[in-house]
Amino acid sequence: MKRHFLIILIVLFQLSLYAQSKKEVKKHKIKASAVSVIENGKTINESKTIFDANGNEIEATDYNKDGTIKEIHKTKYNSKGDEVEDEQYDANNKFVEKKITKYNASGEKSEEIFYDAIGKLTKKHIYTYDGKGLRTERKTTDAEGKIISIKKYVYVTK
């Protein structure tokens, strides 16, 4: 019984680390966190995250149920702490996709540009905002600039 209690306590501690905000990660100088689940007496790793000194998530590894790596994301940030680049790798650490994020003068996300493993543009997300800075639309285009989808955002304020 003590062993089960200890395992549950460890899992809860790991979940609480993973669930921490960027501010808390920085404040407590957390360098890494891991999330695992115990199913039918077997411990299954779900994810591992590495943070920089500013609390930014710089590497995230997701695992399959059998414990093998599913995918890895490596992320870079600008001086304001905004994500500017995310590289995705497969289970064999082979580069799959790169996402570049751009921001407008107000610091709002304006574009996400996706490239495949050979550097070819695959799609773009283009964001628009209203006068209050609220996101109103996300337009997705293919490599040729053809609109694939439009996502509208509506806010109820009263």
Residue ranges and their predicted role:
Residues 20-158:
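Buried hydrophobic residues that stabilize the cores of well-folded domains
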